[in-house]
Amino acid sequence: MAKPIVAIVGRPNVGKSTLFNRLTGGRVAIVEDQPGVTRDRLYRDANWLDREFTVVDTGGLDFGDRENPFSAIIHKQAEAAMEEADVILFLVDGRSGITADDEAVAAILRKAKKPVFLVVNKIEDFSQRERYFDFYSLGLGEPIPISASHGMNTGDLLDAVVAVLPENNGEDDDPDTIKIAVIGRPNVGKSSLVNAILGQERVIVSDIPGTTRDAIDTAFDRDGKRYILIDTAGMRRKGRIEEAVERYSVMRSLRAIDRSDVVLMVIDASQGVTEQDKKIAGYAHEAGKACVLVLNKWDLVPKDDKTMSRFDKVVRSEMSFLAYAPTIYVSALTKQRLPKILELVDFVAEQATRRISTSVLNELLADIQRVTPAPTDRGRRLKILFVTQTAVKPPTFVFFVNDEDLFHFSYRRHVENRFRETFGFEGVPMRFFIREREKEKD
């Protein structure tokens, strides 16, 4: 089920990033920092009163090209938040009071058909009611005074947010249905690829309204299997004036990734891997989803007998954090290799649900430590005492060790590589958690 999205909207310097960090506890992703992942801390998951949701920050945005009018950019930002988020936090500055930009945003948010909270930041003394009562004039209900930097009243704000979060959308979680998110930056051919895949299917069962309000999820059958394609065709930039708003497109990709079983990460082969490609792929990696790299527009690439191997090397180098993901070169236009896509989808979906018995895992673990013992650190050596698989989708393993500080990243990578060589898990990230069983005395 997709997590609800809470968007923080407001002009620059009102404290959006501070509030973002306060609401999300400043968490870091569970996954290890790995070379090659371009991380964009635009979003983080949060949990309050046992409700999970994703907070999206527009902090750090320069409201763009100063030649463009502020009002137009703010207008687009607010519209994007209205379209994509489930709950909107409109943050204003209690010290500076109401500005023309605040009024411009409020005028748009008053039309929103979803909860909007007017949050007045930088209020350290709640007895100074006049500092935030003026904001009633924005027509967005009762202002909620907070101090994001000190955490004052943010608990009450979270209580209010959780109270209006949408309930479980009742999505079909049929384990036999594979949900496929087709993601990628604008103009890489996502829509063409979706249409080409569907065009090959004899039976298109139905169009299902998705959780993103203007998206359509398409269900279809092939060879007795049910698939749902999650449409992210709306992820596109519409002009330079929306430079700031482009970051809101991440909300659609987040929704799609969150709801999916398998992610098709579409890259324009004629342009190669870009920084934006790496950011979007990083979302899927951090979400723990099975992934297939689809290099589209292969028909536009001049070729010789070594072209594909050269591309493979470049893609693996640029996206080293997705080394586990299979790659396929296709053309939505000419239909080249399109049937292979669903074969790979089936394969990585099965890999994501693999479960290895504890006894087999520990047999391999003993062999790993016998053949390649962990290096010593100040005279101490890591001992992995026991490992067990605790989850699938993604495969998750808990290691019990003598000293977690000795389980260095390089040795974790070695263990992961041996796990993959032995058990497969192709196309899926693996999660390792380390638990300290004992501290040995020297």
From Swiss-Prot:
Keyword annotations: GTP-binding, Nucleotide-binding, Repeat, Ribosome biogenesis
Domain KH-like residue range list: 354-438
Positions in coiled-coil regions: none
Residue sites binding GTP 1 per the record: 10-17, 57-61, 121-124
Binding site for GTP 2: 184-191, 231-235, 296-299
Domain of life: Bacteria
GO terms of biological process kind: ribosome biogenesis
The protein, known as: GTPase Der
UniProt KW Nucleotide-binding keyword: yes
CDD domains recorded: EngA1, EngA2
Family: Belongs to the TRAFAC class TrmE-Era-EngA-EngB-Septin-like GTPase superfamily. EngA (Der) GTPase family.
SUPFAM superfamilies: P-loop containing nucleoside triphosphate hydrolases
InterPro entries from the UniProt entry: G_ENGA, GTP-bd, GTPase_Der, KH_dom-like, KH_dom-like_a/b, P-loop_NTPase, Small_GTP-bd
All residue ranges annotated as the EngA-type G domain in the record: 4-169, 178-353
Record's keyword annotation contains Zinc-finger: no
Physiological role: GTPase that plays an essential role in the late steps of ribosome biogenesis.
MF (Gene Ontology): GTP binding; ribosome binding
Lineage: Bacteria, Bacillati, Bacillota, Clostridia, Eubacteriales
Description of how the protein assembles with itself and partners: Associates with the 50S ribosomal subunit.
